[in-house]
A protein has these predicted regions:
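Short beta-strand/loop element within the Bergerat-fold HATPase_c
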Residues: 190-202
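Short conserved segment of the HATPase_c
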Residues: 215-227, 247
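C-terminal end segment of the histidine kinase catalytic
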Residues: 251-284
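Short alpha-helical segment of the dimerization/phosphotransfer core of two-component systems
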Residues: 101-107
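Conserved catalytic submotifs in the C-terminal HATPase_c
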Residues: 26-29, 127-131, 149, 154-164
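Membrane-proximal HAMP signal-relay module
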Residues: 1-61, 78-83, 88, 97, ...
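Short helix-loop "hinge" at the ATP-lid/N-box region of the Bergerat-fold HATPase_c
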Residues: 183-184
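Glycine-rich G1-box
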Residues: 146, 213-214
């Protein structure tokens, strides 16, 4: 039963990888198909938006194709293994989880491709509101509580109070979620992640520091490029889109982002966002 939707999704994805943006995943009936249908919708939406772009760079298509191959291969291989009649329940659960994890990675990549495509083609227009940046940072950080507890990572925060910014809160949350995700992903068990928020009259400055593997200056120079992955071993899961998305959002908000890192020491990302002239309850 699992092999049919997996094959349908992988076949369609392969057509898109080869440049056929008219390919679509058909919706499937049954409550247990809901997860596969969501992936199908993401693939269809990506194909629709990519087909609307007048000029697609060859390297972009090649990189999309390359990044899709790994999760698709996992889905295909484990989908085949699930068909074995004598498969134990333990193995069945293990293989199903592998398919779920691979499909989630594929869906995340689709989401980032769509967001980046819209931002680059000015199809997303910022909707600025004035809000407390410290509160947003804390809310975003708390989403990773289970991760830092599981990895026994020490959390240190130094958040200045009453720092207001006028920005698109939803877009800005993408920045923090990507930076926190990277920090926890690259920090080993027992490490440390530090979040600080400071401000001067003009800017709010956010620093996210980890004690992870770090990176060389050569890698740091390219880290905000689409599909660039400093970890060429693929020991950590990623698709090289998150930081490109972060950079684009910060640019749209006329902010600044930089990175400092040292191999086997850790990494610090610094983001500067212009402060709001007035808080939400203040008047001119």
């Amino acid at each position: 039963m699992v092999d049919r939707p997996v094959k349908m999704i992988t076949d369609t994805a392969e057509k898109i990888m080869n440049g056929d943006f008219s390919a679509r995943v058909k919706q499937m009936n049954g409550s247990w198909m809901e997860g596969f249908n969501q992936i199908g919708k993401s693939i269809n939406k990506m194909a629709e938006e990519l087909s609307s772009v007048e000029t697609l760079r060859t390297d972009f298509i090649a990189n999309v194709s390359h990044e899709m191959k790994t999760p698709l291969s996992v889905m295909q291989n484990y989908g085949t293994l699930l068909q074995a009649p004598a498969l134990s329940e333990e193995k069945r659960v293990e293989y199903a989880k592998a398919i779920t994890d691979a499909s989630r990675r594929l869906a995340d990549m689709m989401t980032n491709i769509l967001k980046l495509n819209r931002l680059e083609n000015q199809q997303i227009y910022p909707n600025p509101t004035t809000f407390d940046l410290g509160e947003q940072l804390c809310e975003s950080l708390l989403q990773y509580e289970s991760t830092w507890e599981r990895k026994n990572i020490d959390i240190e925060t130094d958040i200045a109070e009453n720092v207001y910014v006028s920005a698109d809160a939803e877009l800005l949350s993408l920045v923090w979620n990507n930076l926190f995700s990277n920090a926890f992903k690259f920090t080993e068990d027992g490490g440390k992640v530090t979040l600080t928020l400071s401000a001067d009259e003009a800017y709010a400055t956010v620093k996210v520091t980890d004690t992870g593997c770090g990176m060389s200056a050569d890698i740091g120079a390219h880290i905000f490029e689409k599909f660039y992955q400093g970890d060429t071993s693929h020991a950590t899961q990623g698709n090289g889109l998150g930081l490109a998305l972060v950079k684009r959002v910060v640019d749209i908000m006329q902010g600044e982002i930089g990175v400092e890192s040292a191999v086997n020491v850790g990494t610090t990302f610094t983001v500067k966002i212009r402060r709001a002239e007035y808080g939400p309850e203040e008047t001119r």
